[in-house]
Each structure stands twice: as C-alpha cells, then as structure tokens.
C-alpha cells in the first residue's frame, strides 16, 4: 500500500482537497515539498497530478524503483526488501510485478508535468556515496521534463554519480545564499523545471526550498 501506490496518491489528493474545503487557503497556491521518500512522492505527484500544485520541490528523490532496487543490492542497503514487498516481487519475476515497478516509478510519466507545474529537483553531490539515493535519479528525472537541448548527457550523469564531482566541461553553479554553507555545485533549468546538485548529501536544505516557493508565490501576485 506504500511506495507510490494508488492509495498513497489518493491520500495526497484527499489531503489537498480537505485543506481547500476546511481552511482559508489560496487554492491556486498549494505547494508540495519533500525529501528522500517524500521527494520520491513529490515526483510521483508531479507526474500524476501536476494540476493540483503551484510548485513541487523534490529533494534526494528516487525516480526509478527498478534501478534503485539494484542500487541497494550493490550498496548492501536493505531498502531492496521494502521495494520487493511493495511491488510484489523482484524485477523480472512476472509481467505483473514489472508493471508495478513501472507505474510506481515517476521517471516513466514525469513528462506529464512538463509545462504544467513548476518543479524544483535537488540533491547533494555525495548522495549515493554517503547517502542512499544516487544523484542519477534526480538528474534523469530532470531530463524527463527538460527540453531536448537542455538535457544532461548520460556520460556526464554517470561521471557525476560515480565520482561525486563535476566533469571538467561543466562550470560550477553560481552562488545561492538560500543554500547557506552547502552551495550549488551544478544547476540547470529548462521549461518549468530546474535541477540543483549542491555540496551536501542525502538531505534537504529547508531555507532553499522555502526561498524557491516564496519566489514562485511572489510571481503569482
């Protein structure tokens, strides 16, 4: 019932609807933010219900459960067993199991969010080394919502994921005071999405997420 299931999606939709009905909020200024599993569900909602949100901020996010299953087998982290429980088996066990991996993996439908919701994707450069989710998940998620000219090359993604540093051909991102002492290393924007890799690990920088949402809210006034 967890891990990007229809029940989880329905619960989030219901929570937004409840807030709109019982609280005095601006219906066109609802934001979603999360990190790790919360960031993963931010990407799920971006792909499945972009119309509900003015902006979505996803940090240290998983974008492909099949890939993350193998990531965890290699790293020795036991999250792979949770994935198996959620999806009903290991990748390749059956067509039904593989379909569960597909429909619970936002990388397969994030393109639905392009042009429909503002999306901030961010993670620390050492995630996957000191943390549990390789940065390739965030970079490949960005590629799904980016214009073709702005997509990040697969070789560059593999290098950054493996080496936890920028390729020599990339310039370091401009400073951003909202990130404090964990400054951006890489930043790229395209259409209604942006990705930032910062000098950190598997974490959210609350001040940066809040500043991003405040900026979007100011634009809407």
Role assignments for model-derived ranges:
Residues 18-22, 26-75:
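Primarily recognizes the serine-hydrolase "nucleophile elbow" in alpha/beta-hydrolase
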Residues 1-2, 37-39, 62-65, 125-129, ...:
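Solvent-exposed loop/turn segments at secondary-structure junctions
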Residues 121-123:
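Short beta-strand/loop motif that positions the catalytic acidic residue
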Residues 91, 125-191:
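Active-site-adjacent alpha-helix of alpha/beta-hydrolase-fold enzymes
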Residues 3-23:
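Alpha/beta-hydrolase active-site loop
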Residues 187-221:
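Catalytic active-site module of serine/aspartate enzymes centered on a nucleophile-bearing elbow/loop
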Residues 112-119, 189-193:
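Short, proline-enriched alpha-helix->beta-strand connector loops that line the catalytic pocket
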Residues 54-55, 61-62, 66-112, 162-179:
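Mobile cap/lid helix-loop segments that gate and shape the active-site cleft of serine hydrolases
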């Amino acid at each position: 019932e967890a891990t990007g299931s229809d029940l989880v999606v329905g619960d989030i939709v219901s929570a937004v609807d409840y807030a709109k009905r019982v609280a005095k909020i601006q219906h066109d200024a609802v934001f979603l933010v999360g990190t790790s599993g919360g960031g993963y569900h931010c990407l799920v909602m971006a792909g499945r219900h972009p119309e509900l949100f003015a902006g979505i901020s996803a940090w240290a996010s998983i974008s492909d459960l099949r890939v993350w299953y193998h990531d965890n087998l290699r790293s020795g982290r036991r999250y792979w067993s949770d994935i198996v429980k959620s999806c009903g088996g290991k990748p390749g066990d059956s067509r039904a199991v593989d379909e569960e991996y597909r429909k619970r993996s936002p990388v397969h439908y994030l393109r639905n969010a392009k042009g429909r919701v503002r999306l901030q994707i961010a993670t620390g450069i050492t995630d996957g080394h000191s943390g549990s989710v390789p940065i390739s998940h965030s970079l490949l998620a960005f590629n799904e919502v980016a214009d073709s000219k702005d997509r990040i090359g697969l070789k560059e993604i593999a290098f950054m994921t493996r080496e936890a540093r920028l390729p020599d051909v990339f310039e370091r991102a401009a400073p951003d005071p909202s990130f404090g002492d964990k400054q951006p290393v890489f930043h790229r924007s395209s259409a209604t999405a942006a990705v930032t890799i910062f000098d950190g690990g598997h974490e959210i920088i609350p001040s940066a997420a809040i500043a991003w949402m405040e900026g979007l809210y100011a634009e809407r006034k």
